[in-house]
């Protein structure tokens, strides 16, 4: 039955997209959690709707407009993080609200094109194109290479920014580049995962991995493995149950998180 399903081109593209997303999404999600920036993924995913709406309204490429808007938002978030360290949640709330407001206004002005905005709101990994799959693999390769090359500096930056600065690391530049890469990754994930669920797919596998893994590297491996298993299970279940893939994947991750939380004392005891 599964072999028959794999014969479909759309399912092959969906599986490839899952593999790519499961590589970079948990890694970025882990750093976001440890940097106490979990809301950043939510903020950028909501701001991305403004990019989609601008593209639709102006008749331009929604992908490129989303990338531009999300990168700008990532830069603004980094500025606000440095300038208002104790009020970061306020700035993320403002950006999130502004992104949604701009998206709704431009969507209303675009009229019949509002359905295009809905498709980005909920996403569909089943309808992803070959070009989008290639883009996901490119960002996956970039994130993987950067992680392998700079895992120690990023580790130091994440846990002790002051020490990283004393050691001569370009703290502001590294933090800025991390935000930009995260923003690009989120923008590319939107067509597959949807604005409403992209944050869950980024954060939950990393959070589950943190409950299981004993070292930083093991947490990364666990998060990637959980992301891959959860997303593959989600697309197969969604196909046979005729449910939205993104929502199904999210519920699977939540179930994983619940089970791991219940059995966490046993895992820690071992």
Language-model segments: what does each one mean?
Residues 152-153, 262-270:
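Membrane-interface capping segments at transmembrane-helix boundaries
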Residues 198-247:
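Transmembrane alpha-helical segments in multi-pass inner-membrane proteins
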Residues 47-57, 95-107, 127, 171-182, ...:
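Small-residue-rich segments of transmembrane alpha-helices in multi-pass membrane proteins
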